[in-house]
Curated annotation (Swiss-Prot):
Modified residues (Phosphoserine): S71
This protein's name: Leucine-rich repeat-containing protein 40
One CC-aspect GO term: membrane
Keywords: Leucine-rich repeat, Phosphoprotein, Repeat
Record lineage: Eukaryota, Metazoa, Chordata, Craniata, Vertebrata
Pfam families per the UniProt record, alphabetical: LRR_8 (PF13855)
Gene: LRRC40
Amino acid sequence: MSRLKRIAGQDLRAGFKAGGRDCGTSVPQGLLKAARKSGQLNLSGRNLSEVPQCVWRINVDIPEEANQNLSFGATERWWEQTDLTKLIISNNKLQSLTDDLRLLPALTVLDIHDNQLTSLPSAIRELENLQKLNVSHNKLKILPEEITNLRNLKCLYLQHNELTCISEGFEQLSNLEDLDLSNNHLTTVPASFSSLSSLVRLNLSSNELKSLPAEINRMKRLKHLDCNSNLLETIPPELAGMESLELLYLRRNKLRFLPEFPSCSLLKELHVGENQIEMLEAEHLKHLNSILVLDLRDNKLKSVPDEIILLRSLERLDLSNNDISSLPYSLGNLHLKFLALEGNPLRTIRREIISKGTQEVLKYLRSKIKDDGPSQSESATETAMTLPSESRVNIHAIITLKILDYSDKQATLIPDEVFDAVKSNIVTSINFSKNQLCEIPKRMVELKEMVSDVDLSFNKLSFISLELCVLQKLTFLDLRNNFLNSLPEEMESLVRLQTINLSFNRFKMLPEVLYRIFTLETILISNNQVGSVDPQKMKMMENLTTLDLQNNDLLQIPPELGNCVNLRTLLLDGNPFRVPRAAILMKGTAAILEYLRDRIPT
């Protein structure tokens, strides 16, 4: 009955008179017919300069196929059509929309991104069921006040427009959860924004903001706040009261001081690189109990406090391009997976150690803690034993640091004496890197109940044997610079593995078994011959945050990879694909993922 009521008062001959002629070839009748069944219509990338009238009237006019069959017994019952709920008209040449938009009151999704729109019609207020509105990549200078009538709106994407201010009454969008205002010309954020109490994600990056309102702390559900690339000189202390905040991006601003976060106990990532921060103190660190990523690159830091050891959960620390001359040795006791130090005038760590990577730097710092302990004469007897090969195994490292280290010996096998030295001690890390190993040492199996980190990089491994696959507590595995072209399916049993480094090997595809290790957070597989990845399987890897595919043979990047929204670092340089263009890659992971998502066919 609702359908008959809707067309009451309309010219019932409208569908016969204009239904087909108005659309011409721009919208095939078959597409409209399918849309009446599914409630979804995708007209993206059709070079449209205006929306055909038959689209606005899809649920009003009698369809053309009614000419051929008016029988109530027909299989195709056009009068039982579904209201259009999803309309995608992105990637066209639209300069305006008409008020006929009101003829689609059932819309829940309207996607008109990547057009040439300078305004939105006031009739948009009548789309009261709208939940997602994407108007990004247009030329909007202002938003109509009527947009505040969309009380069911949950996602609003306005990035890459020419907005200079926010409409009055914007705070009435009380159900809004995801708001993207990045890449506009905003100079202020109204205090009334704080009334957006349902907001979970707010992107204000690449604007001209000089300050944030103190009232921002009322956004009690906000988890993701991106203020990169603005003109912020200070952060309101009230921001420290945002108890749900997990990700905070403040890169490329003019901050001179790092804010304190006494109530942000859930904060996992803090990005404050490319500012003018001169000092890092204990007060800045002591409340960051959950922090996993701390980005302080390109600032003016001169030192790192000993209290850095308080960040027990820290995994990635970027200190590159500062004025740091020394590091606290206690930094070596953190379980970092990534430590960037380039561009600092460090006097206490040789450049060759830094060039060997994170684990070598941490190992060096730990060794300096040891050097500050027993005297040299004591350590000669306590920390090493001589093997038949005249090499030494560091007993002190086994006992105090729980590391079995037999690296940089150019050995073709690991002597039994190395494993014998463990005795009844607990060992959590194995470092057999920089040798000539052609196979996994079989006696590693003896340590399967305790080892979490294994470094077998810079060897001559051409296959992985089952000895490695039984290390069920393994969280970190470094296999770079070997001769590997595959991984065994049995590696699926490594149910705690978080980081794997396969760079500089001979892989032609991402090993299938990796898609089934759902605990993986970091995959480094640069400098191989990888020709493809499976975005559908990768989307299932919900913990994956870092994927390095640089310098491979990728001829194309599947748009569906953009759905891997948990990725924080996606590196694609040095591949032969043409799109995304280099300019997109330079904008970083978020821009790459957005670019890919915008090109997913629907």
